[in-house]
Amino acid sequence: MRWTLAAVYGLLLAATLPASTAAAAGNPRIVIVGAGVAGVTAASSLYRAGLTNITVLEASQRIGGRIRTSAFGGAGPVELGAQWCHGEGGNVAYEMASVFPGLLKTSMFTENDFLVQSNGQRVPEEISDRLWELAQSIVESTARDRNTGTLGDFVTTRYRSKIRSDPEYSDINRQLAEQFLVSFHNSERGHYAYDSWYDVAASTDDDYVETEGEQALAWTGRRGFSSILDIITGSFPGSTKSLVPIHQLTKFNKVVSNIRWRGTTDGYVKVTTEDGSLYNADHVIVTVSLGVLKATSRAMFTPALPTINQNAIDGINFGTVNKVFMFFDAPIPAGFGNVVNLLWFDRDLQALRQSKHAWAEAVGFFYRIDSKPYVLCAWLNGAQGRQAELLSDATIQEGLLYLLSLFGRNYKFGNVQSILRSKWSSDRFIRGSYSSRSITTERLETGPNNLARPLRDAANEPQVMFAGEAASATHYSTVHGAMETAQREATRLINLYK
């Protein structure tokens, strides 16, 4: 390229111009807060479109956010965060990954899903299938739309009525039916990351759209789910995408403490971090978790966020699910099941609640991990799952082995060699797992679209934008939902500078 004096002068001028002028010159300064999958997707989309003046501020020392593939001794990598690719058609993560043969496969999680009682007895498949179908039909019933109570009231009332009066279920023991209802509630708590279905309105306006195809696709290879980050940035082996230097664009250990988005003398958005660093930006894309926004939004934004955004932050639920992986010195017994849902006899549950293992009521189910025959994972839900984060590894291991002594008493397990677990609620930079709707969401008449409303300047141009799974109306709680919102906000800026 031949550099003329005018061209050099133009570059120097762009570096010193007020924000609006520099942006008009096609050289906008863009700050992205957070280097989870939404931040990485936004940065990559912008960079490939020629908007390369990007700074990603990441509070931790790693890229990925709630995608956290971790080494687990001799077992290989496991997923402390996002576990499966949910769906195929209409899933941007699947569409990117499916280019690479063998990277995704149907998880063993989808089969050999058992109901097991605390005396170690497995519920016959013919009965378990009918109980699952009944509960799911109630949850998916359109009658919910006309109900003014909680989801818990709606489900329990209809379920018990069916069990009591419908001849189809006359052969099912009432005690077993109640055990299943408790277990189903725990399963739903894990699925939607709420503490209780009594915190959710029966008539909740849930716009979630399930993508087509298999809903539990496991990631293969040593990078596991983290492969999607490499695919997005073009660093995955065999990728044909241009490489985005995401690590060069990212500044680590940068905890954003304030975003001044209006009233600055030079027109820039001012982003301040806890270490005193200041970053000027024409545009900011905030991709931190909803949990972080709930904890910090009132102090983070100057002036305060518009009510429509703040109500969304306050109203959308952000709950916690955790995983504990156990690595045994022998394979998990073959007949144990790929997924084991826990059904408690009342006497056993009362004994648990009065013991030092009371926190273990948080465990909704155990499940095997694809291609890891020596590993078993426990899925922990709700308030007790958060409590468990504060306990030692030894205490957690002892409690889980106590559960296996009940529910797996008919099988011989090896010795636990090590455990690895997530602590999403107590992670200062995450503060939970994923979003869902609650009674508060309905009361405030809010939702993801309100959270995603951009903060605009006097010229009605977007200054601060929001991306992440909680900002997706149709695919919240998923990686592909987070990616879609990041593409949405990146496209907003790309179109602005065409």
Walk through the language-model features, giving the residues of each.
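FAD-dinucleotide binding site
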Residues: W3-K498
